[in-house]
């Protein structure tokens, strides 16, 4: 049976550190690669990421700035922002063995190309095996060993199962799937919808409005997923409904917190507070892709318009509430 005993994690931010911890708990030999010199030094000397304070890195994890060292692992987790994934994979490609699984752990769509994460991997490293990890998971929870379930998808069922086994620990439970598109699509779409939910919270519109926004947001996710070939069961699973539910209900979500700040009257630049809210980058791309397939996404459209400065929060809310009445889907 296929197995991966060594795992490299590229990216020493909060999520990368958490996944490195998970790999170590699962009994794998883990190498954590960090590009940033200051954070790499912090990880090596103090065994703590600048982006995840209070979590001590497992002593078995090797920290490196040498990409070729990380490339020797049997499976590689790509825990870098969606918009720099292509750059990282392009640098990694000449260093890896054929069929090495490259697992995207970012939730987004590339600007300009409209490519999903596994499509970028396939283009930049054609000899690799693209895969995706997604689901309702916060770095702080995972790093501390709190119970979490995610989905890992690859087109080859055996590889997906082996990757899930490699990251399986007592508290981190990966389910495996072959619906790569469905898994990555859910993660990217929910980022935009979480901003909308945050706006509702920040505007203090109440629990009823938040429930309505989340539910109708899921309808948009389903429409978009169906148009782009996702399986219905995937949309109803961890990487779809599960991730959406989590990120539309707690300030631990960067996208939700970003939306809360927008709802309180902050500008997009002020609302970011120096942290990456991937949904802000994904929103305009998502809308372009929806138009190509004639998919109606009014909530996502409103978020994109707010971020572009084309409409105020109050005007966006009014436009959603005054849309023509229709039968529920």
UniProtKB/Swiss-Prot annotation:
<dbReference type="InterPro" id="IPR006109">
    <property type="entry name" value="G3P_DH_NAD-dep_C"/>
</dbReference>
<feature type="binding site">
    <location>
        <position position="15"/>
    </location>
    <ligand>
        <name>NADPH</name>
    </ligand>
</feature>
<feature type="binding site">
    <location>
        <position position="137"/>
    </location>
    <ligand>
        <name>sn-glycerol 3-phosphate</name>
    </ligand>
</feature>
<feature type="binding site">
    <location>
        <position position="35"/>
    </location>
    <ligand>
        <name>NADPH</name>
    </ligand>
</feature>
<dbReference type="InterPro" id="IPR011128">
    <property type="entry name" value="G3P_DH_NAD-dep_N"/>
</dbReference>
<feature type="binding site">
    <location>
        <position position="276"/>
    </location>
    <ligand>
        <name>NADPH</name>
    </ligand>
</feature>
<dbReference type="GO" id="GO:0046167">
    <property type="term" value="P:glycerol-3-phosphate biosynthetic process"/>
</dbReference>
<comment type="similarity">
    <text>Belongs to the NAD-dependent glycerol-3-phosphate dehydrogenase family.</text>
</comment>
<protein>
    <recommendedName>
        <fullName>Glycerol-3-phosphate dehydrogenase [NAD(P)+]</fullName>
        <ecNumber>1.1.1.94</ecNumber>
    </recommendedName>
</protein>
<dbReference type="GO" id="GO:0047952">
    <property type="term" value="F:glycerol-3-phosphate dehydrogenase [NAD(P)+] activity"/>
</dbReference>
<feature type="binding site">
    <location>
        <position position="135"/>
    </location>
    <ligand>
        <name>sn-glycerol 3-phosphate</name>
    </ligand>
</feature>
<comment type="function">
    <text>Catalyzes the reduction of the glycolytic intermediate dihydroxyacetone phosphate (DHAP) to sn-glycerol 3-phosphate (G3P), the key precursor for phospholipid synthesis.</text>
</comment>
<keyword id="KW-0560">Oxidoreductase</keyword>
<feature type="binding site">
    <location>
        <position position="254"/>
    </location>
    <ligand>
        <name>sn-glycerol 3-phosphate</name>
    </ligand>
</feature>
<feature type="binding site">
    <location>
        <position position="278"/>
    </location>
    <ligand>
        <name>NADPH</name>
    </ligand>
</feature>
<feature type="binding site">
    <location>
        <position position="51"/>
    </location>
    <ligand>
        <name>NADPH</name>
    </ligand>
</feature>
<feature type="binding site">
    <location>
        <position position="107"/>
    </location>
    <ligand>
        <name>NADPH</name>
    </ligand>
</feature>
<feature type="binding site">
    <location>
        <position position="254"/>
    </location>
    <ligand>
        <name>NADPH</name>
    </ligand>
</feature>
<keyword id="KW-1208">Phospholipid metabolism</keyword>
<dbReference type="Pfam" id="PF01210">
    <property type="entry name" value="NAD_Gly3P_dh_N"/>
</dbReference>
<keyword id="KW-0963">Cytoplasm</keyword>
<keyword id="KW-0521">NADP</keyword>
<dbReference type="InterPro" id="IPR036291">
    <property type="entry name" value="NAD(P)-bd_dom_sf"/>
</dbReference>
<dbReference type="InterPro" id="IPR013328">
    <property type="entry name" value="6PGD_dom2"/>
</dbReference>
<comment type="pathway">
    <text>Membrane lipid metabolism; glycerophospholipid metabolism.</text>
</comment>
<dbReference type="GO" id="GO:0008654">
    <property type="term" value="P:phospholipid biosynthetic process"/>
</dbReference>
<dbReference type="GO" id="GO:0005829">
    <property type="term" value="C:cytosol"/>
</dbReference>
<feature type="binding site">
    <location>
        <position position="253"/>
    </location>
    <ligand>
        <name>sn-glycerol 3-phosphate</name>
    </ligand>
</feature>
<feature type="binding site">
    <location>
        <position position="139"/>
    </location>
    <ligand>
        <name>NADPH</name>
    </ligand>
</feature>
<feature type="binding site">
    <location>
        <position position="190"/>
    </location>
    <ligand>
        <name>sn-glycerol 3-phosphate</name>
    </ligand>
</feature>
<dbReference type="GO" id="GO:0005975">
    <property type="term" value="P:carbohydrate metabolic process"/>
</dbReference>
<feature type="active site" description="Proton acceptor">
    <location>
        <position position="190"/>
    </location>
</feature>
<keyword id="KW-0443">Lipid metabolism</keyword>
<dbReference type="InterPro" id="IPR008927">
    <property type="entry name" value="6-PGluconate_DH-like_C_sf"/>
</dbReference>
<feature type="binding site">
    <location>
        <position position="107"/>
    </location>
    <ligand>
        <name>sn-glycerol 3-phosphate</name>
    </ligand>
</feature>
<dbReference type="InterPro" id="IPR006168">
    <property type="entry name" value="G3P_DH_NAD-dep"/>
</dbReference>
<feature type="binding site">
    <location>
        <position position="243"/>
    </location>
    <ligand>
        <name>sn-glycerol 3-phosphate</name>
    </ligand>
</feature>
<dbReference type="GO" id="GO:0006650">
    <property type="term" value="P:glycerophospholipid metabolic process"/>
</dbReference>
<keyword id="KW-0594">Phospholipid biosynthesis</keyword>
<keyword id="KW-0444">Lipid biosynthesis</keyword>
<keyword id="KW-0547">Nucleotide-binding</keyword>
<feature type="binding site">
    <location>
        <position position="255"/>
    </location>
    <ligand>
        <name>sn-glycerol 3-phosphate</name>
    </ligand>
</feature>
């Amino acid at each position: 049976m296929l197995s991966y005993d060594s795992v490299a994690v590229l990216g020493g931010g909060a999520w990368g550190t958490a996944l490195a911890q998970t790999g170590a708990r699962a009994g794998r030999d883990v190498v954590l690669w960090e590009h940033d010199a200051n954070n790499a030094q912090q990880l090596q000397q103090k065994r703590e990421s600048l982006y995840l304070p209070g979590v001590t890195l497992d002593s078995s994890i090797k920290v490196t700035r040498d990409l070729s060292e990380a490339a020797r692992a049997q499976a590689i987790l790509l825990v870098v922002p969606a918009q720099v994934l292509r750059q990282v994979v392009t640098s990694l490609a000449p260093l890896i063995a054929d069929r090495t699984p490259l697992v995207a752990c970012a939730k987004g769509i590339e600007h300009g190309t409209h490519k999903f994460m596994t499509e970028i991997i396939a283009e930049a490293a054609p000899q690799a095996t693209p895969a995706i990890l997604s689901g309702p998971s916060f770095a702080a929870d995972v790093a501390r060993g709190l119970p979490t379930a995610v989905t890992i998808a690859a087109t080859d069922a055996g590889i997906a199962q082996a990757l899930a086994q490699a990251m399986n620990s007592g508290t981190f439970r990966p389910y495996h799937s072959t619906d790569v598109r469905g898994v990555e699509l859910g993660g990217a779409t929910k980022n935009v919808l979480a901003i909308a939910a945050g706006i509702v919270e920040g505007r203090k519109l109440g629990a009823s409005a938040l429930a309505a926004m989340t539910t109708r947001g899921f309808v948009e996710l389903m429409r978009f997923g169906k148009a782009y070939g996702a399986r219905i069961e995937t949309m109803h699973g961890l990487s779809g409904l599960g991730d959406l539910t989590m990120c539309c209900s707690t300030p631990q979500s960067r996208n939700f917190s970003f939306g809360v700040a927008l709802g309180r009257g902050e500008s997009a630049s002020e609302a970011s507070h120096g942290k990456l809210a991937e949904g802000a980058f994904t929103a305009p791309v998502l809308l372009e892709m929806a138009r190509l397939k004639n998919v109606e996404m009014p909530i996502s459209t409103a978020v994109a318009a707010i971020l572009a400065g084309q409409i105020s929060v109050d005007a966006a809310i009014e436009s959603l509430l005054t849309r023509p009445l229709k039968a529920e889907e």
